[in-house]
């Protein structure tokens, strides 16, 4: 018989830097889950990823106080800012452009994000990422 699911917890945790402090501790503590067990498992699983890169994680909490978690790819905005070498997007994206990205750069980001997007193919994924870039005030070439 399958375990009874108590709930889902969605967090953004820096890769390799999970610790019991907020937001992880309180979120897991409310469900009675072992915080240190999650931190050790998360840090072990994110060992090969750039330290400090925020990763979305979905934790499934079960009635017997056990859990499983699924790592997602980093948010598109984080990857776009990294590729464009900027700290933040434009406060007025359609009036002020802060950077330029080429189609090749967007394809690299789309390859990372494609498993988390609902895009039917790679071209659709690139267009989705291009839309995110435009909404941040980044000029997109070749799309």
Swiss-Prot record:
Record's comment on post-translational modification: One or more lysine residues are methylated.
Pfam families associated with the record: Ribosomal_L11, Ribosomal_L11_N
GO biological process: translation
Keyword rRNA-binding: yes
A GO cellular-component term linked to this record: cytosolic large ribosomal subunit
The keyword Mitochondrion appears for this protein: no
SMART domains xref list: RL11
Entry-linked InterPro entries: Ribosomal_uL11 (IPR000911), Ribosomal_uL11_bac-typ (IPR006519), Ribosomal_uL11_C (IPR020783), Ribosomal_uL11_C_sf (IPR036769), Ribosomal_uL11_CS (IPR020785), Ribosomal_uL11_N (IPR020784), Ribosomal_uL11_N_sf (IPR036796)
Single GO term (MF): structural constituent of ribosome
Entry keyword set: Methylation, Ribonucleoprotein, Ribosomal protein, RNA-binding, rRNA-binding
Recorded superkingdom: Bacteria
Family: Belongs to the universal ribosomal protein uL11 family.
Record's subunit section: Part of the ribosomal stalk of the 50S ribosomal subunit. Interacts with L10 and the large rRNA to form the base of the stalk. L10 forms an elongated spine to which L12 dimers bind in a sequential fashion forming a multimeric L10(L12)X complex.
Function per UniProt: Forms part of the ribosomal stalk which helps the ribosome interact with GTP-bound translation factors.
Protein name: Large ribosomal subunit protein uL11
